[in-house]
């Protein structure tokens, strides 16, 4: 050991600025690499509330072995908000509903769209209301209904394709954007509702909601579509997306089986 304190040499003092710049560059590169690594781990999905509440989590639970090292971010919203998130690359994958007359127009050079399966908007009510609804003559009493607003996709389908074409008279009891709120409101008897089958599988299975099996209350078919960005990241995740689509189809088809078992003829 020496009694003299260490001191930078003249050469080191001259290079101090260059050394500091080099260290700053190294830190920046390290930070960018870490951020890029984290981004590669995340699969961000946008979906309608009705899809993100029940069927998508069920499907994700079946492909966990493929998700090792990946984190799922599930963003819920209405159809237009989800599509905007996809096109601004806030998410890389979108799951949505379509019908033959209500399709999502996509830029095909940026987005790949595939059909996953079909879902159904089915008429349901609480067990206590089933007998009342069975005795309502078309065009007579007002039937209380719980539904979506008309300015969102599912609301448009219910109001334009089902209520407007029905021989029954309806009175709006409650309106909600969230499928879960409509499920709860219908379950406690605020009114009947048309709800996505995939969202109410458990309620039908356990008798908390009853399917209204009548020509006066038709079923409306929906196509479940998957939209994914044409990026290198999504190319690497193609097997994950394909597996998710397969399991989502199985999940929704399981709900069809529950519907068949729950039919109560009016």
Labelled PLM ranges:
Residues 105-114, 118-119, 184-230:
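Beta-alpha-beta core module
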């Amino acid at each position: 050991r020496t009694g003299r304190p260490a001191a930078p040499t003249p050469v080191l003092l001259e290079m101090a600025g260059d050394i500091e710049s080099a260290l700053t560059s190294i830190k920046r590169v390290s930070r960018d690499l870490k951020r890029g690594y984290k981004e590669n781990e995340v699969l961000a999905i946008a979906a309608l509330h009705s899809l993100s509440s029940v069927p998508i989590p069920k499907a994700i639970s079946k492909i966990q072995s493929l998700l090792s090292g990946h984190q799922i971010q599930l963003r819920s919203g209405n159809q237009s908000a989800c599509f905007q998130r996809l096109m601004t690359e806030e998410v890389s994958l979108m799951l949505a509903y379509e019908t033959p007359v209500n399709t999502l127009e996509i830029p095909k050079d940026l987005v790949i769209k595939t059909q996953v399966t079909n879902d159904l908007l089915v008429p349901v009510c609480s067990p206590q209301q089933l007998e009342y609804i069975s005795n309502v003559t078309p065009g007579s009493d007002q039937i209380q209904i719980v539904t979506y607003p008309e300015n969102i996709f599912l609301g448009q389908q219910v109001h334009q394709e089902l209520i407007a074409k029905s021989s029954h008279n309806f009175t709006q009891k409650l309106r909600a954007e969230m499928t879960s709120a409509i499920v709860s409101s219908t379950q406690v008897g605020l009114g009947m509702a048309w709800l996505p089958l995939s969202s109410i599988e458990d309620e039908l299975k356990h008798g908390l909601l009853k399917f209204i099996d009548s020509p006066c209350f038709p079923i409306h078919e929906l196509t479940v579509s998957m939209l994914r960005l044409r990026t290198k990241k999504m190319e690497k995740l193609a097997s994950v997306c394909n597996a998710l689509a397969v399991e989502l189809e199985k999940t929704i088809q399981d709900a069809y089986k529950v519907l068949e078992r729950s039919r109560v003829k009016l």
